[in-house]
């Protein structure tokens, strides 16, 4: 079976800026891998290329053995994606959004249970635009995992959360690992990477510094 994520010599430029520079990366099954680095290090761009949102300028990417762009329709149902800053429908209620995502899966997690686990029960009927930033982040995480994907990409999953919410999210990510889900997360917090990851890859200026 192919490894869940494989990048070979991946480069992405935006004008004169090289966001990712010749990156090699391999993620093993059921591994939690943290991409650790400061803002602007190239972490989000790396994840966006793996998700098929951004096309690399050079190198090759395989996710679950597939090309994230050419095979996106086949890949999409098998991966969970949590975007930085949430990315929901402003007028949709929290529970509606989660139920909509769950409906695309043959064997979803129970949306009501997931909302409760993430402390969103009281916000279930609140529209997305009226949720706090931390609530939007937690809802984005719920949407990423409700379909029981094989592989989850989490971009700064606890950004803007208080300490209690952060611990709840950490426990949920730990549960994904125990269930055999492969997780790739980005963070600029060393403590978060150490707490969650089986392997930490430090990225700066779009290149791997250490692993």
What is each PLM-predicted segment?
Residues 51:
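Helix-to-loop junction immediately C-terminal to a conserved catalytic motif
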Residues 59-70, 75:
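Conserved ABC transporter NBD signature motif
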Residues 141:
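Hydrophobic anchor residue at the start of the ABC signature
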Residues 99, 103, 108-123:
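Conserved ABC ATPase "signature" region
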Residues 152-156:
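Catalytic Walker B motif of ABC-type/P-loop ATPase nucleotide-binding domains
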């Amino acid at each position: 079976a192919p490894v869940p994520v494989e990048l070979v010599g991946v480069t992405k430029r935006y004008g004169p800026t090289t966001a990712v520079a010749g990156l090699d990366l391999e993620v093993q099954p059921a591994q939690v891998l943290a991409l650790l680095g400061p803002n602007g290090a190239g972490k989000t761009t790396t994840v966006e290329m793996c998700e098929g949102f951004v096309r690399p300028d050079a190198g090759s990417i395989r996710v679950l053995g597939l090309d994230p762009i050419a095979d996106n329709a086949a890949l999409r149902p098998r991966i969970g994606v949590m975007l930085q800053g949430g990315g929901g429908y402003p007028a949709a209620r929290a529970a509606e959004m989660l139920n909509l995502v769950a409906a695309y899966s043959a064997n979803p997690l129970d949306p009501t249970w997931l909302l409760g686990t993430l402390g969103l029960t009281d916000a279930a009927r609140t529209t997305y635009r009226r949720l706090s930033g931390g609530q939007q982040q937690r809802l984005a995480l719920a949407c990423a995992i409700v379909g029981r994907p094989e592989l989850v990409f989490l971009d700064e999953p606890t950004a803007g959360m208080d300490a209690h919410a952060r611990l709840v999210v950490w426990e949920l990510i730990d549960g994904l690992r125990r269930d055999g889900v492969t997780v790739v997360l980005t963070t600029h917090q060393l403590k978060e990477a150490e707490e969650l990851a089986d392997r930490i890859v430090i990225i700066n200026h779009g290149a791997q510094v250490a692993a």
